[in-house]
Amino acid sequence: MARTDPGFVSRIVFLLLPTTPHDKKRPPTGAHSLFWLSIFFNGATFSYMSQPDFQPTLVGPTITVRPISADDWKDLFAAGSDPKIWEVHPVPDRYTEAGFRKFFDGAVDSKMGFAFVDRANGRLIGSSRYYGYEPESGEIEIGWTFLARSHWGGAANREVKGLMLDHAFTFADTVVFWVGEQNWRSQGAMTKIGGRKREGLFTRALSGETPYFIFEITKARYESGGRTLLA
């Protein structure tokens, strides 16, 4: 930046702006925890909006959801190298070392990925990530989720989804889940936690021609009673 006389800077104002989708005068993020820094230089205004924290550590009663790291490879592959986990998944070979390596590296590189830790014994039992945050629509995806079979059928899925939804709704208005057309297991799990299916089937470039259903949970519905489905 060019050097300027101190008198050039008239004032610096830090503003915390709680935004809503209905407030047209405020930034259209649908977020309630974003900070705007407005700097006024002789009438010129420059604004900076901080990014949400996409990789916090979230602690539940029995599971900790923490940022994934490259050091997690061995233990997470041990948890995910079970063919049964992936048998109805759009990528059924993810139990192989090559298949899981692609999944794992994508999670680490995304800077939005998580590992699930069983608090009782410190073991890694699964993974998930946020993806594709859209500030203008206030929408973000939760996906790439798996749990070791030792934690199927209990409260583990509800617990990790609840932790991730609670955090997502500090800055987003809608959370979506892309679920493969043949993945009846995950479709059932989405229904149990209050996900509503959008009409039709969807595809996207990162998944090729694989058809998906999209389930969504809105912040309004979640706060008006949907959270109780995850208790």
Enumerate the predicted regions with their spans.
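Conserved catalytic-core motifs of GNAT/GCN5-like acyltransferases
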Residues: 178, 196-212
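A short, internal acetyl-CoA/4′-phosphopantetheine-binding micro-motif in the GNAT/acyltransferase core
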Residues: 117, 143-155, 180
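Conserved active-site alpha-helix within GNAT-family acetyltransferase domains
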Residues: 183-199
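Conserved GNAT acetyl-CoA-binding A-motif
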Residues: 170-179
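A short helix-loop-beta-strand connector motif used in the catalytic cores of GNAT acetyltransferases and
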Residues: 105-115
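Conserved acetyl-CoA-binding loop-helix of GNAT-fold acetyltransferases
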Residues: 154-167, 188, 192
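A short, well-structured alpha-helix characteristic of acyl/acetyltransferase catalytic modules
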Residues: 46-102, 220-231
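Conserved beta-strand in the GNAT
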Residues: 115, 123-132, 141
